[in-house]
């Protein structure tokens, strides 16, 4: 069994690395240069970087040139996310040289387009499933978490049947809160698809990472780690050691 892959997150607003609380615009804490942040995680042993253009995700501009610069300076693989919702933005994202892109809102709002790009690009396209549990129902959220995107299980079944190669699963009540991951949600998604699942949101401790790592045999391949690293709850080398024990 492969050890859990850790993807340190670099969220970019106006060229700077930031962290949001529950993905809300305006809730960010700034951590400095995005290039420096990404190179720092590479230096600390990261094999992947999760790079997010929050300006593009919220529809208020783009950091495309900077993202391409970050990808170009890194030797490790990059998963690129934020505002990828049509052929033009997808082509621009892939042109940075990233290993794969995450499609979010477009998978909910434009299912025909999403099915086509899954078919055309295969392993280079992952789909982000941002989940909010309301009265026991698992609802998907789109457009920076402002809109309802339907029932998680229905959409997962559709995307799985279309051959989606990977799902990035976020419990949005947990993201940026250091509140612990939603293990039941991760296991539930992993059990319903043969595609690998990447966990996102809520990681606050090495024990959280060890808990996610117990799900690798069920199909959870990796975990995105953001605020806990920036808040110095643990170092990346400590985290890598914890999931390889």
Curated annotation (Swiss-Prot):
Record Pfam families: His_biosynth
GO biological process, one term: L-histidine biosynthetic process
UniProt keyword annotation of Ribonucleoprotein present: no
Protein's organism: Mycobacterium tuberculosis (strain ATCC 25177 / H37Ra)
Record's GO cellular component terms: cytoplasm
EC number, as in UniProt: 5.3.1.16, 5.3.1.24
Keywords: Amino-acid biosynthesis, Aromatic amino acid biosynthesis, Cytoplasm, Histidine biosynthesis, Isomerase, Tryptophan biosynthesis
Active-site positions on this chain: 11, 130
Name this protein carries in UniProt: Phosphoribosyl isomerase A
Pathway: Amino-acid biosynthesis; L-histidine biosynthesis; L-histidine from 5-phospho-alpha-D-ribose 1-diphosphate: step 4/9; Amino-acid biosynthesis; L-tryptophan biosynthesis; L-tryptophan from chorismate: step 3/5
Gene Ontology molecular function: 1-(5-phosphoribosyl)-5-[(5-phosphoribosylamino)methylideneamino]imidazole-4-carboxamide isomerase activity; phosphoribosylanthranilate isomerase activity
PANTHER family: 1-(5-PHOSPHORIBOSYL)-5-[(5-PHOSPHORIBOSYLAMINO)METHYLIDENEAMINO] IMIDAZOLE-4-CARBOXAMIDE ISOMERASE
Family indicated by similarity: Belongs to the HisA/HisF family.
Subcellular location: Cytoplasm
Keyword presence, Isomerase: yes
Catalytic activity: 1-(5-phospho-beta-D-ribosyl)-5-[(5-phospho-beta-D-ribosylamino)methylideneamino]imidazole-4-carboxamide = 5-[(5-phospho-1-deoxy-D-ribulos-1-ylimino)methylamino]-1-(5-phospho-beta-D-ribosyl)imidazole-4-carboxamide; N-(5-phospho-beta-D-ribosyl)anthranilate = 1-(2-carboxyphenylamino)-1-deoxy-D-ribulose 5-phosphate
Signal peptide: none
Enzyme class: isomerase
Physiological role: Involved in both the histidine and tryptophan biosynthetic pathways.
The encoding gene: priA
């Amino acid at each position: 069994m492969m050890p859990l892959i850790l993807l340190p997150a670099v969220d970019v607003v106006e060229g700077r690395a930031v962290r949001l609380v529950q993905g809300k615009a305006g809730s960010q804490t700034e951590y400095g240069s995005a290039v420096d942040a990404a190179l720092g995680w590479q230096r600390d042993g990261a094999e992947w970087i999760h790079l997010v253009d929050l300006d593009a995700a919220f529809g208020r501009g783009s950091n495309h040139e900077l993202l391409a610069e970050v990808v170009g300076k890194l030797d490790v693989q990059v998963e690129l996310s934020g505002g990828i919702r049509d052929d033009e933005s997808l082509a621009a994202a892939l042109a940075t040289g990233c290993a794969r892109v995450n499609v979010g809102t477009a998978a909910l709002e434009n299912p025909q387009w999403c099915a086509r790009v899954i078919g055309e690009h295969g392993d280079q396209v992952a789909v982000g499933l941002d989940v909010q549990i309301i009265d026991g129902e698992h609802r998907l959220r789109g457009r920076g978490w402002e809109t309802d995107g339907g029932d998680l299980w229905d959409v997962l079944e559709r995307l799985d049947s279309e051959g989606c190669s990977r799902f990035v699963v976020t419990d949005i009540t947990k993201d940026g809160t250091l509140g612990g991951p939603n293990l039941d949600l991760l296991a539930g998604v992993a059990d319903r698809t043969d595609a690998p699942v990447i966990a996102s949101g809520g990681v606050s401790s090495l024990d959280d990472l060890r808990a996610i790592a117990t799900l690798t045999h069920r199909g959870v391949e990796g975990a995105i780690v953001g605020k806990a690293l920036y808040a110095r709850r643990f170092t990346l080398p400590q985290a890598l050691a914890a999931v390889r024990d």
